[in-house]
Curated annotation (Swiss-Prot):
Subunit field text: Part of the 50S ribosomal subunit. Forms a cluster with proteins L3 and L19. In the 70S ribosome, L14 and L19 interact and together make contacts with the 16S rRNA in bridges B5 and B8.
TM regions (residue ranges): none
PANTHER family registered for this protein in UniProt: 50S/60S RIBOSOMAL PROTEIN L14/L23 (PTHR11761), LARGE RIBOSOMAL SUBUNIT PROTEIN UL14M (PTHR11761:SF3)
Domain of life of the native organism: Bacteria
InterPro entries recorded: Ribosomal_uL14, Ribosomal_uL14_bac-type, Ribosomal_uL14_CS, Ribosomal_uL14_sf
Protein name stated in the entry: Large ribosomal subunit protein uL14
Cellular component terms per the entry's GO annotation: cytosolic large ribosomal subunit
Function: Binds to 23S rRNA. Forms part of two intersubunit bridges in the 70S ribosome.
Pfam families: Ribosomal_L14
Length: 122
């Protein structure tokens, strides 16, 4: 469950290390984002030679949340951290690698590139 001002780790090699959520896309009064949702973020920490610089505003898709995710079959899944993957303006990946597992809900929302690059889909 991601809301405004939530800090997220970055799960790709785009150069950003930490993001802060500014807005959740998809509805005027939408309060929370979960796995597979697109959010607008500010880059809080970045590598000095990365593609993304500190202070830049980017879009990202959430791939892991600490809050339990309720599946349709009754199962729950929970990750150790909140993490996202940085996107460009055309909603394509900036990085070329994904680190750590991602939730299956990313596939349902049409981000097949993330699913194919991820080492594990849970």
């Amino acid at each position: 469950m991601i809301q405004s001002f939530t800090r997220l780790a970055v799960a790709d090699n785009s150069g950003a290390k930490e993001l802060m959520c500014i807005k959740i896309l998809g509805g005027s009064k939408r309060r929370y984002a979960t796995v597979g949702d697109i959010i607008v973020c500010s880059v809080k920490k970045a590598l000095p030679n990365g593609k993304i610089k500190r202070g830049q505003v980017v879009k990202a898709v959430v791939v892991r949340t600490k809050k339990e995710l309720h599946r349709g079959n009754g199962s729950l899944i929970r990750f150790d951290e909140n993490a996202a993957v940085v996107l460009d303006s055309k909603k394509e990946l900036i990085g070329t690698r994904i680190f750590g597992p991602v939730g299956r809900e990313v596939r349902y929302n049409g981000f097949m590139k993330i699913v194919s690059l991820a080492p594990e889909v849970l």
